[in-house]
From Swiss-Prot:
Name of the protein in question: DNA recombination protein RmuC homolog
Domain of life of the source: Bacteria
Function summary: Involved in DNA recombination.
Coiled coil segments of this chain: 16-201
Keyword Coiled coil among UniProt keywords: yes
Keyword terms: Coiled coil, DNA recombination
Length: 453
């Protein structure tokens, strides 16, 4: 029994110990809450003190505002009294000026109608003079352009007509040239018999070549040059017989140094065997000359913009035709080496084409120059039109400024003319008077009314 009671007592003691521990923790929490509440109470006390100070300042501000409000109310009552006095004075002035305003309004309407009529007449006259002046100046600007365009059209028409005549005359010229070549062939054959030396043959070939160039219409020093000295890449010297210039900074080389000794022997031979041998030598000499001329490669020379081929000129038509009859492939073989064999007939036709190219180039240059001048003239015309618009705007601004200045002189109460005339009426010494029509427009008021204003 005692043991059970001890056990029970022990259990009760353990429970009390647990409650004691719980109470201790609760007490500790209460202590913490008390400390926190004490801090909050202190903060509330400080806040209450601040609110008291703020309430005191608010009371002071309220007193000041009440004082200011009383002053403002007194000021407002004074202003209301002044406003009533000013309103009464304003009504009196409005009543006194209303009649004058009615009279002035009717006079102003009449003056405005007169001024509008006068301004319309002035604007119509100015517009008419301005239109006449503009038309005259526009004609002065357009007449040169019209004349230049007409001249250009005339030159183009003449160029087309000239080209048509030249095409027609070219066929006639070729027919005449064929007949001439027949005679030249006979004369050249006889002349060949007389030309024995290689140097003499070369000089004679150059002479015939230059005569053909002149006959084609080409001018020395302009469309062609003779004996031009050129330098190769390795410093070697070349001197072609003739350089024919083409449009676009191109040149054509013409060589006239072909040997005709074998052909002279062919003409002079009486035996068929000797003639065949001489003809064979003539073809061989011509081939050798083509090969040597091709090896010079004029295209690589400094300062020369040659075409891909060189013209080999044979001054005797019969020598050319005889070689082709004996060797039909001669022309094609030479062409494969960039050499074109030409006679006086074929060269003249080629030169005619070159001369036509030069004429076309000069016409194109003239057309470009005319187009540039026409464009420049058109640009100046555009600038003139812009200046014309600006002049019109300035005239409109000038009219507005003139109307504004005129209004300052004659319109409104106390305008300049009215005030100036009132000074004169008050006794200002003046030797001159304003025009009557200006005084009528300004409606000069009597001195008494001016004083009232």
């Amino acid at each position: 029994m005692l043991g059970e009671r001890l056990a029970t007592a022990q259990l009760a003691q353990d429970g009390l110990n647990a409650q004691l521990e719980t109470s201790r923790e609760a007490y500790q929490q209460l202590g913490e809450r008390h400390a926190r509440f004490a801090g909050e109470v202190a903060a509330l006390r400080r806040e209450a003190e601040l609110m008291g100070e703020e309430r005191q300042r608010a009371s002071q501000a309220e007193a000041r505002w009440a004082s200011e409000r009383q002053g403002r109310e007194e000021e407002l009552r004074r202003l209301a009294s002044e406003r009533a006095a000013l309103a009464a004075e304003l009504r009196e002035q409005q009543e006194s000026h209303q009649q004058r305003l009615t009279d002035l309004q009717s006079a102003r309407d009449e003056l405005r109608a007169q001024f509008a009529e006068l301004a319309g007449k002035i604007f119509d006259e100015r517009e008419q003079r301005f239109a006449e002046t503009s038309q005259q100046r526009l004609g002065q600007m357009l007449d040169p352009l019209k004349e230049r365009i007409q001249a250009f059209e005339k030159r183009v028409e003449e160029s087309y007509q000239q080209e048509a005549r030249e095409r027609f005359s070219l066929s006639k010229e070729l027919e005449r040239l064929q007949q001439l070549n027949l005679r030249l062939g006979e004369e050249a054959t006889n002349l060949t018999r007389a030309l024995k030396g290689q140097k003499t043959q070369g000089n004679w070939g150059e002479l015939v070549l230059e005569r053909v160039l002149e006959h084609a219409g080409l001018e020395k020093g302009r469309e062609y040059e003779t004996q031009v000295s050129l330098k190769g890449a390795e410093g070697e010297r070349f001197q072609p017989d003739v350089l024919i210039r083409l449009p676009g900074d191109k040149q054509v080389v013409v060589d006239a140094k072909v040997s005709l000794t074998a052909y002279q022997q062919y003409i002079a031979a009486d035996d068929d065997l000797l003639r065949q041998q001489a003809l064979k030598q003539h073809v061989t000499s011509l081939r050798n000359h083509v090969k040597g001329l091709s090896g010079k490669d004029y295209r690589r020379l400094e300062g020369l913009h040659s075409l891909d081929f060189v013209l080999l000129f044979m001054p005797i038509e019969a020598a050319f035709s005889t070689a082709l009859q004996a060797e039909p492939n001669l022309f094609q073989d030479a062409f494969a080496q960039n050499i074109v064999i030409v006679s006086p007939t074929t060269l003249l036709a080629t030169l005619r084409v070159i001369d036509s190219l030069w004429r076309q180039e000069r016409q194109n240059q003239n057309a470009r120059e005319i187009a540039e001048r026409a464009g420049s003239l058109y640009d100046k015309f555009v600038l003139f039109v812009q200046d014309l618009d600006e002049v019109g705007s300035r005239l409109q601004q000038l009219d507005k400024a003139y109307a504004a200045a005129r209004n300052k002189l004659t319109e409104g109460r106390g305008n300049l003319i009215s005030r100036s005339e009132q000074l004169k009426l008050l006794g200002a010494r003046a030797s001159k008077s304003l025009p009557t029509d200006w005084l009528d427009r300004a409606l000069v008021a009597p001195v008494e009314e001016a004083g009232e204003e």
